[in-house]
Amino acid sequence: MNKPQHHSLIILGSGPAGYTAAIYAARANLKPIMITGMEQGGQLMTTTDVDNWPGEAPGLQGPQLMERMQKHAERLDTQFIFDHINEADLNQRPFLLKGDNATYSCDALIIATGASARYLGLPSEKAYMGKGVSACATCDGFFYRGKKVAVVGGGNTAVEEALYLSHIASHVTLIHRRDKLRAEKMLSAQLIKKVEEGKVAIVWSHVIEEVLGDDQGVTGVHLKHVKEEKTQDLTIDGLFIAIGHDPNTKIFKEQLEMDEAGYLRAKSGLQGNATATNIPGVFAAGDVTDHVYRQAITAAGMGCMAALDAERYLDSLNQA
């Protein structure tokens, strides 16, 4: 095995948490290395309108915000490595990370790997992935211009996807397993307006039992009522999955403490260690540890705290 590339501080992930950590770490002269992962920019790269970023009164696009963050980190001489880490050994010092392209070691590690879209888990869903089934309306919505589509879910992501698609598709159906939305009130109100305009329909209290299709792709979905013995088929050309996310923490299992859903557990912060994990020198920031707030601004704030925590930790090593 080639000798690992050693760095004082490595940041895994390139979303708001990772970029903010890089900015603060660079300003502290920690010479941070960011390993971007496969999806540089994180979930915001597939978010159309960011209307709640402080100071951006007109609003801006998700990719636009991430580009600004990247340029900010670049200006401060953050080094970017385009690689995907698939194995981590946090039980040795320095920490060891194995990627697709190289092996790395570091004295301190900030994990900002975020979360990925969750799928229904149906064999038929997997069979039509990329052939009518998608988890990203902003990525694939264009292909359904003038066609009928459905979105499954009831939270912010599902409503945002439905609203976005309502400007492209001929008709959008939102399928939700509950009898009310979990999305923010403002988003829900916007969706109800689309329903009143006839551009969107909502199918309450139903789940998808099967994705229907042929050699060309998706043709519909088979739905079942969650309480009653009723089923129905819905004819659509595309299905967008928006039922939540799973944290990207698989490579850290049995090393770092996690909750039952796989989110990393961080300390309380009462002693200036808000992002510290159970392993000294390893810090967590953003959606990889937060499944409650899950906002760009909170992820960025945690990235800031992780950099400050890492700085204190590295200082303690130098003083030892």
Curated annotation (Swiss-Prot):
Miscellaneous information on this protein: The active site is a redox-active disulfide bond.
Keywords associated with the record: Cytoplasm, Disulfide bond, FAD, Flavoprotein, NADP, Oxidoreductase, Redox-active center
Primary subcellular site in the record, as a coarse category: cytoplasm
UniProt-listed SUPFAM superfamilies: FAD/NAD(P)-binding domain (SSF51905)
Enzyme Commission identifier(s): 1.8.1.9
GO cellular component, one term: cytoplasm
Cross-referenced Gene3D superfamilies: FAD/NAD(P)-binding domain
GO biological process, one term: removal of superoxide radicals
Keyword Disulfide bond tagged: yes
Family: Belongs to the class-II pyridine nucleotide-disulfide oxidoreductase family.
Name the record gives this protein: Thioredoxin reductase
Quaternary structure note: Homodimer.
Subcellular location(s) per record: Cytoplasm
Cofactor dependency: FAD
